[in-house]
């Protein structure tokens, strides 16, 4: 009888109920809210769903992220091994290759001025950097946090790992991906506030056709130029352009399909669950997390506003040939930001088609965010 009682007592105390804190329960609720947003509202479900599930798992069973040095038998938790691939900057680079394989740089090649709009939208990154310094973060932490302003989750993870800010990786990644999914909610009010209805109705001319040779040369030239100037950007820009070269060369269709489909989705699963698993209650529920979330929102708003304002400047310079709305697409949330530009423009004039024009600044923003990350790495002497 004593044996049965002891066994039952051990079983009961092995349940998670006796090992969780109020913080764990709060994070479980947050994870369930994220799952609801991903499934019911379809807010970036490909990313938000695995992130939310990783968050759920680590707050029920913390040992799923057990560090190998803390393990009594020398074996780490399952998601710990996934997380190492984030820390080693492997996952973000593979994500960039997949993005490159899915991206058409034709609108950017057809209208090189789009680079300026993509660059203008990076203002949010540097606004967040100085804001983070003012809030008491050190230089490297501020740099890692600031990339949220580019609405680029993989680059945020990449830079946080390279700068040794792994303790902040969870809040940074969750904030970055959350704001990426909230692009359709955050951007329109800013865009409408900074533009007149007349400006939103501006119709832009047809983009010129882009030859196959131009599309093949573009990733090669960008890789050479950017990597020579900022070698630290090679892992991100190089993988982005390699994926695009797969696509545009037309001779490696199998590699294009693999990079843009099977490999991409495998990496998203591993990246999402491991990032979510960094959000344990003890790591996530603190003042720094609130600061990071606030800074991310401010940075994203600043980046959107800077893009729109520069778009207005280009509108004046071209005597009304540029719709300022495409400037907001300069953040690197591809293709969500470009779709928002199209949607807001269509609300003013249903016959206005801005999507392809907005894709230029949008893909330029991807390159711009990677360059900003490389700049921070160069400044801090990290390779």
Feature roles, as predicted:
Residues 108-129, 280-307, 358-362:
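Entry/N-cap segments of selected transmembrane alpha helices
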Residues 39-48, 67, 81-82, 102-117, ...:
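Interfacial helix-loop-helix linkers and transmembrane-helix boundary segments
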Residues 223-310:
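Transmembrane helical segments that form the transport core of multi-pass membrane transport proteins
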Residues 175-251:
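Membrane-embedded hairpin module used as a gating/binding unit in multi-pass transport
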Residues 1-19, 25, 71, 75, ...:
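Intrinsically disordered, low-complexity non-transmembrane regions of multi-pass membrane transporters
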């Amino acid at each position: 009888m004593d044996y049965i009682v002891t066994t039952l007592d051990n079983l009961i105390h092995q349940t998670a109920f006796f090992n969780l804190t109020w913080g764990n329960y709060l994070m479980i609720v947050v994870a369930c809210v994220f799952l609801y947003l991903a499934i019911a509202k379809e807010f970036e479900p490909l990313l938000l769903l695995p992130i939310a599930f990783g968050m759920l798992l680590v707050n029920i069973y913390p040992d799923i992220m057990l560090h190998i040095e803390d393990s009594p038998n020398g074996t780490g938790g399952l998601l710990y091994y996934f997380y190492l691939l984030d820390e080693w900057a492997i996952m973000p680079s593979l994500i960039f290759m997949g993005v490159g394989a899915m991206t058409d740089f034709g609108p950017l090649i057809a209208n090189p001025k789009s680079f300026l709009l993509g660059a203008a939208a990076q203002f949010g990154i540097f606004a967040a950097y100085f804001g983070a310094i003012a809030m008491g973060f050190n230089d490297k932490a501020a740099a890692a946090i600031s990339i949220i302003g580019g609405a680029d989750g993989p680059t945020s993870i990449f830079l946080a790992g390279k700068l040794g800010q792994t303790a902040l990786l969870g809040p940074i990644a969750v904030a970055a991906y959350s704001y990426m999914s909230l692009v359709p909610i955050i951007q329109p009010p800013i865009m409408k506030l900074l533009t007149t209805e007349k400006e939103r109705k501006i119709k832009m001319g047809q983009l010129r056709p882009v030859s196959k040779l131009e599309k093949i040369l573009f990733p090669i030239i960008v890789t050479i130029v950017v990597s020579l100037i900022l070698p630290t950007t090679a892992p991100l820009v190089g993988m982005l352009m390699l994926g695009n070269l797969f696509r545009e060369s037309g001779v490696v269709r199998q590699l294009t399909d693999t990079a843009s489909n099977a490999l991409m989705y495998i990496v998203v699963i591993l990246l999402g669950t491991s990032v979510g698993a960094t959000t344990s209650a003890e790591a996530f529920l603190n003042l720094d997390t609130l600061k990071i979330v606030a800074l991310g929102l401010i940075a994203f708003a600043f980046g959107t506003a800077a893009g729109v304002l520069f778009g207005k400047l280009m509108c004046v310079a071209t005597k009304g040939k540029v719709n300022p709305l495409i400037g907001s697409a300069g953040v690197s949330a591809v293709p969500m930001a470009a779709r928002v530009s199209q949607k807001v423009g269509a609300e003013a004039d249903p016959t206005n088609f801005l999507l392809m024009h907005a894709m230029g600044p949008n893909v330029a923003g991807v390159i711009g965010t990677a360059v900003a990350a490389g700049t921070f790495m160069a400044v801090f002497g990290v390779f």
